[in-house]
């Protein structure tokens, strides 16, 4: 899935659209996407000027965004239909290595449960095949 199609599933835009490409998607099961980390991104101005590191909260947000795409594709809905997914919670978040400019962040999400519009995903972010972050992410589907 290319960026123009991603924009059909996510309401986010620059500088907060954190998914560059979807590599694989199995509706109702799994998604894998990528975020290319570049020094030109605004967060690196202050995090940190002489030692740029991708903020952990943005890694979590990127994982939540791919999870949201999976939810939308699974249900056959899009933001244009008047729906969105809100980040509702995180559990078991672990950061294992810093993510720096030049890295390609692979984002993976697997559906654990879906009960009445509350979705639970098992998520991972990887760089060069190594897990840099893992989390359980909850999203809430809402009609706008």
Curated annotation (Swiss-Prot):
Question: Could you tell me which Pfam families the record lists for this protein?
Answer: FabA
The answer on whether this UniProt entry bears the keyword Lyase reads yes
What residue ranges carry the coiled-coil annotation? Answer: none
Q: Where in the cell is it found?
A: Cytoplasm
Q: GO CC terms on record?
A: cytoplasm; membrane
Please give the superkingdom of this protein's source: Bacteria
Q: Which reaction does it catalyse?
A: a (3R)-hydroxyacyl-[ACP] = a (2E)-enoyl-[ACP] + H2O
> What is the annotated signal peptide range for this record?
none
What EC number(s) is this enzyme filed under? 4.2.1.59
Task: Name any one GO molecular function.
Answer: (3R)-hydroxyacyl-[acyl-carrier-protein] dehydratase activity
- Keywords linked to the UniProt accession: Cytoplasm, Lipid A biosynthesis, Lipid biosynthesis, Lipid metabolism, Lyase
Catalytic machinery residues: 47
* Major localization class: cytoplasm
InterPro entries associated with the record: FabA_FabZ (IPR013114), FabZ (IPR010084), HotDog_dom_sf (IPR029069)
List this protein's GO terms for biological process.
fatty acid biosynthetic process; lipid A biosynthetic process
Function of this protein? Involved in unsaturated fatty acids biosynthesis. Catalyzes the dehydration of short chain beta-hydroxyacyl-ACPs and long chain saturated and unsaturated beta-hydroxyacyl-ACPs.
Which family does the entry's similarity section mention?
Belongs to the thioester dehydratase family. FabZ subfamily.
Alphabetized NCBIfam families for the sequence = fabZ, PRK00006.1
What name does UniProt use for this protein?
A: 3-hydroxyacyl-[acyl-carrier-protein] dehydratase FabZ
């Amino acid at each position: 899935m290319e960026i123009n199609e991603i924009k059909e599933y996510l309401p986010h835009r620059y500088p907060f659209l954190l998914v560059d490409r979807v590599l694989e998607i199995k509706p109702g099961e799994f998604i894998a996407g990528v975020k290319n980390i570049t020094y030109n991104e605004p967060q690196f101005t202050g995090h940190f000027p002489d030692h740029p590191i991708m903020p952990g909260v943005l890694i979590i947000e990127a994982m939540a965004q791919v999870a949201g795409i999976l939810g939308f594709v699974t249900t056959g809905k899009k933001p244009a239909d008047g729906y969105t997914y809100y980040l509702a919670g995180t559990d078991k978040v672990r950061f294992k290595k810093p993510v720096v400019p030049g890295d390609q962040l692979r984002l993976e999400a697997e559906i654990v449960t879906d009960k009445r519009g509350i979705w639970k995903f098992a998520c991972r972010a990887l760089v060069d095949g190594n897990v840099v972050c893992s989390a359980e992410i909850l999203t809430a589907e809402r009609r706008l």
